[in-house]
């Protein structure tokens, strides 16, 4: 464990995610003192010659008071209105706080749709790299004004994991109002903090849902553990801790929960396919094709397709489903949906003779495919 914590202290490029609950007052508004305390820690990291990207929630919380809202509204329209007003205030607060250290900030607003569109994905990566190279401090947020998934489900945790992979981070730090994952409700006596998670099997039997609840935000412990799973599977270790203990955690101290990296760093597009892409349709596979794709890691051929759903274009991400409707894989399809009816169930050799050599190929190549359920 000591070696793992030492690796935290030695990480050079770090993504830090902070939730609304760590930036707000008891009444739910933005707390300038808490923002300044976080910036003090982040600025010190930059001074130690580290590159840091901040993924920050808080736009909705910052917009509550200016709009006369006593608490986070439940209806989507007012949530988005609060986000629209609050995002500017949130960035202004960060700008003023970082100015104490002579550091400029750069705002990057993303949505799940941006991460799903490959061109946007590449541009976001280049922008973040350039901001870091030019000495600016990137502050990323889900675009709450239009990103309904984030507002409803607290998707900034997952966004942070994807950003960590996007910028090839050495470490992801998730800051919350709870000091790590506990084996029960941390407010009750007798519960213990889990110092490390070597693989997700270590959490079997742990009631993650009781280990922390967000107030003005939406991302509870469940979404944070899911974000840790995504990052760890992509080869990025994760520290989940309280914002109060951020400095100690980033220095490699024994605080929070450390998630060991469980996988190798994968190609950007594979993580994007598995966790960020929005499927534009589905291909239903027969039993033989399911075995070939899932167990044999083979490409999907027309002969193994039993049905087509949705209206997709060549190059779009689609789900591959078994006969029960379960999504077993996801991949980039090589044909438009309108072409599929004349292809399904037929051999590539037969299609090449009838339609030409362009049709003697896979519907989904194995290099453009990720398995969801082995």
Curated annotation (Swiss-Prot):
MF GO annotations: ATP binding; glutamate 5-kinase activity; RNA binding
Q: Which domain of life is it from?
A: Bacteria
- List the Gene3D superfamilies hit by this protein, alphabetically: Acetylglutamate kinase-like, PUA domain
Could you tell me which pathway this protein works in? Answer: Amino-acid biosynthesis; L-proline biosynthesis; L-glutamate 5-semialdehyde from L-glutamate: step 1/2
Q: Cite the EC number.
A: 2.7.2.11
User: Which PROSITE patterns does the record associate with it?
Assistant: GLUTAMATE_5_KINASE, PUA
Where does the PUA domain start and stop, copy by copy?
280-358
Q: Where does substrate bind?
A: 57, 144, 156
Gene Ontology biological-process entries: L-proline biosynthetic process; proline biosynthetic process
Provide this UniProt record's keywords sorted from A to Z: Amino-acid biosynthesis, ATP-binding, Cytoplasm, Kinase, Nucleotide-binding, Proline biosynthesis, Transferase
Which Pfam families does this chain map to? AA_kinase (PF00696), PUA (PF01472)
Matching entries from SUPFAM superfamilies are given as: Carbamate kinase-like (SSF53633), PUA domain-like (SSF88697)
Function per UniProt: Catalyzes the transfer of a phosphate group to glutamate to form L-glutamate 5-phosphate.
Q: What is this protein called?
A: Glutamate 5-kinase
Source species, please? Streptomyces coelicolor (strain ATCC BAA-471 / A3(2) / M145)
């Amino acid at each position: 464990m000591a070696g793992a914590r030492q690796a935290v202290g030695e990480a050079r490029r770090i993504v830090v995610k902070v939730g609304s609950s760590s930036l707000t007052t008891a009444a739910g508004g933005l707390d300038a003192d808490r923002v300044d305390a976080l910036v003090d820690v982040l600025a010190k990291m930059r001074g130690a010659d580290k590159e840091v990207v901040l993924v920050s929630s808080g736009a909705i919380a910052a917009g509550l008071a200016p709009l006369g809202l006593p608490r986070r509204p439940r209806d989507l329209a007012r949530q988005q209105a609060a986000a629209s007003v609050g995002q500017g205030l949130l960035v202004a607060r960060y700008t003023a706080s970082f100015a104490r250290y002579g550091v400029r900030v750069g705002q990057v607003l993303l949505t799940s749709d941006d991460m799903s569109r490959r061109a946007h994905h590449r541009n976001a990566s280049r922008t973040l790299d350039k901001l870091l190279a030019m000495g600016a401090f990137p502050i990323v947020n889900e675009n709450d004004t239009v990103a309904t998934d984030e507002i409803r489900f607290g998707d900034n945790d997952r966004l942070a994991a994807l950003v960590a992979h996007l910028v090839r981070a050495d470490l992801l730090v998730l800051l919350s109002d709870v000091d790590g994952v506990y084996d029960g409700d941390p407010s009750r006596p007798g519960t213990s903090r889990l110092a490390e998670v070597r693989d997700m099997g270590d959490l079997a039997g742990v009631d993650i849902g009781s280990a922390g609840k967000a107030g003005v935000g939406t991302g509870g412990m469940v979404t944070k553990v899911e974000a840790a799973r995504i990052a760890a599977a992509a080869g990025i270790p994760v520290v989940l801790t309280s914002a109060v203990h951020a400095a100690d955690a980033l220095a490699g101290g024994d605080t929070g929960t450390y998630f060991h990296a469980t996988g190798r760093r994968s190609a950007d597009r594979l993580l994007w396919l598995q966790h960020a892409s929005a499927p534009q349709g589905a291909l239903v596979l027969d039993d033989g094709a399911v075995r070939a794709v899932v167990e044999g890691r083979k490409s999907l051929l027309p002969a193994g397709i039993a049905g087509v759903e949705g209206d997709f274009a060549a190059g779009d991400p689609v789900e591959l489903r078994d006969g029960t409707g379960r999504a077993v894989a996801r991949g980039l399809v090589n044909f438009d949906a309108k072409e599929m009816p004349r292809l399904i169930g037929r051999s590539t050799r037969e299609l090449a003779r009838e339609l030409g050599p362009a049709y003697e190929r896979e519907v989904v190549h194995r290099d453009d495919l990720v398995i969801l359920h082995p």
